[in-house]
Amino acid sequence: MADMVRAVVQTGPRQMEMREYPRPVLGPTTGAVLRVEACGICGSDVEQYKGAMGARGLPMIPGHEPLGIIEEITDETAARWGVQAGDRVAVEILIPCRSCNRCLAGNYMNCRNRIGSHGGGNPPERQDRLTGGYAEYMDLHPNSIVHPIRNDIPAEIAVMYNPLGAGVRWALEYGGVHLGSTVLVMGAGQRGLAAILASRYVGAGTIIATGLARDAKKLALAKEFGADYTINVDEEDTVARVRELTDGGVDVSLDLTPMAQQPILDAIEATRWGGTIVLAGLKGHKEIAGLKTDMLINKALTVKGAFSVDASGYENAIKLIESGQFALEKMQTHKYGLDDVEHAIKLLAGELPGEEGIHVAVMPGM
């Protein structure tokens, strides 16, 4: 067993380097040692890589969608998590205190005394720990939250638990999509596709997906996953087309686009009176030019911000993965080892001409 393990560290915008760390050892703040099988890459990883999310917490080991095998675990942590050495688990992003009023009320995603995170910014005392998924091993705090997932599912499929959890939660829990709903999904990335899949699963009436001209393959997959119509926003007027297809507007609009502002304005126009808008695409803390809040009032719209995924979203996603009902392998387009992490991120960002990725995974064992 190696004494040193490798991890990819981000030191600044578009700056990554390989470093070696001591293999984690069980202790008061290390409840388990995880051998990382795979870690998904999403749009926020891209923005973090570019520097759009600021320098807070750097240097850090990115990777907030890790999946792996527990190699060592303390008795106390095993009892808390309900798992044992040899189990495969999906790891949640945040490490809550588990004792503040918010945690005790079930709102641990908004913990007042957060210990840190997996793959995001951490306090100084945790910055030298193997906390992110772009590593061969991870140091899991006893307060981390994990979800068991079957070992016989290919790792590159099982690791989709995060985007699938987001799609399920944002469409069904926040959006309230149900039998007969008309739904607009703006953004045909992995979370958009997951939202389409979830909406179709519960019997949505009409599902419309939007994307850019370069998203042709994603939009084709959106139709395979259940979208009735797709809109190329580079060539068509989203609002006009939605109104044409729905006789006035959709019940639910989901904006899952990173940084783009126009989808928010389109959602307000394209959603029917009394409908719901779910905003999940981060915009880099920028103001939205042209936003008219009177329209929200006059149309009696409900607007919800969708922050990450919670335990129910993860558990529903894992049930979906384990069911084998869906051709999830069609979403999984690329997998790379640690030496090629930057290439993987640039691919997902659309920065590599001729290459298009949907779900891209880092596989430290490759």
Where are the language model's segments positioned?
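Short Gly/Pro-enriched turn/cap motifs at secondary-structure boundaries
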Residues: 11, 23-24, 57-63, 125-131, ...
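Glycine-rich beta-strand-centered segment in the early N-terminal region that forms part
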Residues: 22-39, 53-104, 150-152
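Mid-domain Rossmann-like dinucleotide-binding core that forms the NAD(H)/NADP(H) cofactor-binding site
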Residues: 86, 136, 150-236, 240
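Glycine-rich phosphate-binding loop and adjacent beta-alpha segment
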Residues: 204, 217-223, 228, 260-323, ...
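N-terminal Rossmann-like NAD(P) cofactor-binding module of classical short-chain dehydrogenase/reductase
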Residues: 254
